[in-house]
């Protein structure tokens, strides 16, 4: 059974891909919110054996627009009893456009959002909350219109637990 000769989604032109990306950016700006992306600046102290970063340092904050993809409730396990007692895990999923990330965040050091970086959401809880990126999904819209580079990133965030990290961004709310 052959495909339609009138629609060719994989040899599309750059203008169609740009239009699709423009629509994504515009919808995030209309329905989204302003937040801050805080990258981890301390790459030299990373433990290569265990893959963890014992001394995290967040010294810069980049204003970006995000879209809250699940606005009804927190995701994840929420409240449950573990071996350490009652744990409350609030997970949030947000969408950020690749173009706005590339325009505002220096591309020589950060090509994409990384796991372990922070996102500040100013309107949650009335005072704002910090969330840590647990997974940055860049394959959500896989090869839409034949484009390999993602149009947006879906970030899965978990509420940040402060443990002696250095946070000095210059933003008053953080």
What are these regions (language model features)?
Residues 101-102, 140:
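Short acidic, S/G/P-rich loop/turn micro-motifs used as interaction or catalytic elements
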Residues 98, 123, 135-137, 161:
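Residues that form ligand- and interface-recognition hot spots within folded domains
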Residues 113-115, 140, 164-166:
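Capsid-like jelly-roll
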Residues 122-127, 165:
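Secondary-structure boundary elements
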Residues 106-124:
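Short coil-to-beta transition motif at edge beta-strands of beta-rich domains
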Residues 128-142:
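Short beta-strand-centered aromatic/proline hotspots
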Residues 1-89, 93, 99-101, 148-174:
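N-terminal disorder-to-order initiation segments that are Gly/Lys/Arg-biased
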């Amino acid at each position: 059974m052959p495909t339609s000769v009138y629609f060719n989604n994989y040899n599309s032109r750059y203008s169609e891909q740009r239009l699709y990306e423009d629509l994504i950016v515009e919808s995030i700006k209309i329905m989204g919110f302003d937040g801050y992306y805080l990258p981890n600046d301390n790459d030299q102290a990373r433990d290569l054996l265990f893959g963890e970063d014992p001394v995290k340092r967040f010294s810069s904050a980049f204003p970006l627009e995000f879209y809250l993809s699940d606005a009804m409730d927190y995701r994840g396990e929420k409240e449950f009893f573990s071996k350490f007692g009652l744990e409350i895990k609030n997970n949030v999923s947000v969408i950020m456009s690749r173009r706005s990330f590339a325009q505002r965040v220096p591309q020589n050091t950060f090509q994409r959002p990384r796991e372990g970086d922070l996102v500040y959401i100013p309107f949650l809880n009335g005072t704002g909350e910090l969330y840590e990126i647990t997974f940055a999904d860049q394959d959500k819209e896989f090869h839409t219109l034949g484009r390999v580079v993602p149009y947006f990133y879906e970030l899965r965030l978990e509420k940040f637990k402060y443990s002696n990290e250095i946070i000095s961004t210059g933003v008053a709310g953080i």
